[in-house]
Amino acid sequence: MPHDHHHVLATYHKAGEKEVQMAIDAAMKAHKEWSELPWVERASVMLRVAELLSTKYRYILNASVMLGQSKNPFQAEIDAPCELIDFLRFSTFYASQVYADQPYSETGILNRMEYRALEGFVFSLTPFNFTSIASNLNMAPAMMGNVAVWKPSTTAIHSNYFLMKVFREAGLPDGVVNFIPGQG
């Protein structure tokens, strides 16, 4: 880990071409159902992640960030739980405003703005030093109905993998966010 390179915190399989293709295939398979899910149901997953991180998993996430990214308790708390929970809650709040904001309609005429997800997937190459941003680069697009292929930094894999487990526990369906650790 950054402060002690001889201490092994975890091991992981480095994804190759086959795993990357599997992640892309899984994302595209999940795309239609996830993008057509009502936004309030997608928002409920984000809010469950925020709730799990603010209660049950707060200290585990802090410890993972401290060990994996060599942050002190104060830095870990600000980076991971605090900022990440804010990102998740803000994203759902602002999504509600985006979906509610509609153009003016005259009597007998309906003007309506419809939002749709991207036709492909989001590729997120996340930073080594901010666990909260690693989550946000995946979950903000997911909030809006997109699917993602996530390549975490090799020095942040432990905390990022932990987040992926929390996403799953919160009800994020298979294929919506696809975690592929590897070189680069």
Regions found by a protein language model. Give the residues of each.
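Alpha-helix initiation/capping motif
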Residues: M1, N72-P73, P127, Q183
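Short conserved beta-strand segments at catalytic cores or DNA/RNA-binding microdomains
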Residues: M1-D4, A142
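Glycine-rich loop-to-alpha-helix module at the N-terminal edge of alpha/beta enzyme cores
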Residues: H3-Y99
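Rossmann-like NAD(P) dinucleotide-binding subdomain of oxidoreductase/dehydrogenase enzymes
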Residues: M66, F93-G184
